[in-house]
Curated annotation (Swiss-Prot):
Protein family: Belongs to the UDP-glycosyltransferase family.
GO biological process, one term: response to toxic substance
Chief place where the protein resides: nucleus
One Pfam family, short name: UDPGT
GO cellular component, one term: nucleus
Binding site for an anthocyanidin: 18, 391
Protein name: UDP-glycosyltransferase 72E1
Record keywords: Detoxification, Glycosyltransferase, Nucleus, Transferase
Group of enzyme by EC: transferase
Cellular compartments annotated: Nucleus
């Protein structure tokens, strides 16, 4: 069989924040850079947001081949109460034999393998099948910088940050405050630490690191990662900024009642509230949020899910809408829906977020600060209320609020206690009707312009980065052709 074009295999972790950017990266490689693309995804509950998205017209994955893989049974390998990151890591690790078999069966073998952070155990497949290997960071450059730098800390520096709670100073980057550090790196005795920190040594073994950001979003951090005298020395391989990867919006392909409702609202008058596919709040916090929204007197669209008693990521990979009482879910204040029905719209499961944030009626976004959500907000030109819950979201909130000036946030972290209805009301009004919100709206619309420039086929940084990756695959493919000819 004559091979005429490069073929990339991609391995995506479960969850919307991982699936969406992987699919968009695959579509870009196929549509603009001539790749055949195979994306391996773990099959999840049909009711989950991931399954709904993959089966929706908005996914628009005609350019790529999505291969569903059975989710391995990890019940005997992981404690049911383990942090979701550990569960994802073990799921991905246990799926590698299946991926190996799938690649062995392919007539057109991949020339490149792209894995995300939870799939790093698959990197050795590159050597087995003569593939280039790339690590895809679906999050941002700051997260990548910490993942690379943390394993290099000596005991004194680690003690300064973890015990004395001093900021972590990385070469060429803004310092990372203790309260913004991922829980992954804070307990050397935890399974999470033992699993993730050694991953820093894997990065230099691949052919490149792909990161979902662009120069104007994170100028200092990207410069450090690409400078061989700074963090580039630790990375040891090229770092390719290819962002923003966000799903293009086509309202004609999306049929959802929330879009019909938004069509009837004034421009920039609606606050969109969503905590992602896995974020969740306590019962008390949900109550305060509902009252804060009602007191603000602002229009809103709220993707609302039942409260949880555990961690803020307890709903990851699951979905549950709760019981309805007089039009109001039983976990919200009685009568909330009837009192707010003229200015509010409730969604209990998956919502077409990219379309919502691109709608002219939306003027603010209360977000958990997942990177995919942030990028969709930037591309939509929508300022944010930062409400970080877990993982790198605290770092993301600091970037939005303190460095870019496109978000407001509460006085304390949500993990430190309940944010009161009065503060929520003030935050909502600040972003929707006050001068501070108007200034942030101007800033984020300028950032939106730089995002479009990055994606431009006429010299955009993201396009040029992927062109270099395509060139590397073409060179490998040519070597394979020469070997086949006996050259």
């Amino acid at each position: 069989m004559k091979i005429t074009k490069p073929h990339v295999a991609m391995f995506a972790s479960p969850g919307m924040g991982h699936i969406i950017p992987v699919i968009e990266l695959g579509k870009r490689l196929a549509g603009s850079h001539g790749f055949d693309v195979t994306i391996f995804v773990l099959e999840t509950d049909a009711a989950s947001a991931q399954s709904q998205f993959l089966n929706s017209p908005g996914c628009d994955a005609a350019l790529v081949d999505i291969v569903g893989l059975p989710t391995p049974d990890i019940s005997g390998l992981v404690d049911p109460s383990a942090f979701f990151g550990i569960k994802l890591l073990v799921m991905m690790r246990e799926t590698i034999p299946t991926i190996r078999s799938k690649i062995e069966e392919m007539q057109h073998k991949p020339t490149a393998l792209i894995v995300d952070l939870f799939g790093l155990d698959a990197i050795p497949l590159g050597g087995e099948f003569n593939m280039l290997t790339y690590i895809f960071i679906a999050s941002n450059a700051r997260f990548l910088a910490v993942a690379l730098f943390f394993p290099t800390l000596d005991k004194d520096m680690e003690e300064e940050h973890i015990i004395k709670k001093q900021p972590m100073v990385m070469p060429g980057c803004e310092p990372v405050r203790f309260e913004d550090t991922l829980e992954t790196f804070l307990d050397p005795n935890s399974q999470l630490y033992r699993e993730f920190v050694p991953f820093g040594s894997v990065f230099p073994t691949c052919d490149g690191i792909i990161v979902n950001t662009w120069d104007d979003m994170e100028p200092k951090t990207l410069k450090s990662l690409q400078d061989p005298k700074l963090l580039g020395r630790i990375a040891g391989v090229p770092v390719y900024p290819i962002g923003p990867l966000s799903r293009p919006v086509d309202p004609s392909k999306t049929n959802h009642p929330v879009l019909d409702w938004l069509n009837k609202q004034p421009d920039e008058s609606v606050l969109y509230i969503s905590f992602g596919s896995g974020g969740s709040l306590s019962a008390k916090q949900l109550t305060e949020l509902a009252w804060g929204l009602e007191m603000s007197q602002q229009r809103f669209v709220w993707v609302v899910r039942p409260p949880v008693d555990g961690s803020a990521c307890s709903a990851y990979l699951s979905a549950n809408s709760g019981k309805i009482r007089d039009g109001t879910p039983d976990y919200l204040p009685e009568g909330f829906v009837s009192r707010t029905h003229e200015r509010g719209f409730m969604v209990s499961s998956w919502a077409p977020q990219a379309e919502i944030l691109a709608h002219q009626a939306v003027g603010g976004f209360l977000t958990h600060c997942g990177w995919n959500s942030i990028l969709e907000s930037v591309v939509g030109g929508v300022p944010m209320i930062a409400w970080p819950l877990f993982a790198e979201q605290m770092m993301n909130a600091t970037l939005l609020n303190e460095e870019l000036g496109v978000a407001v946030r509460s006085k304390k972290l949500p993990s430190e206690g309940v944010i009161t209805r009065a503060e929520i009301e003030a935050l909502v009004r600040k972003i929707m009707v006050e001068e501070e919100g108007a200034e942030m709206r101007k800033k984020i619309k300028k950032l939106k312009e730089t995002a479009a420039e990055s994606l431009s086929c006429d010299g955009g940084v993201a396009h040029e980065s992927l062109s270099r990756i395509a060139d590397e695959s073409e060179h490998l493919l040519e070597r394979v052709r020469c070997m086949a000819r006996g050259a």
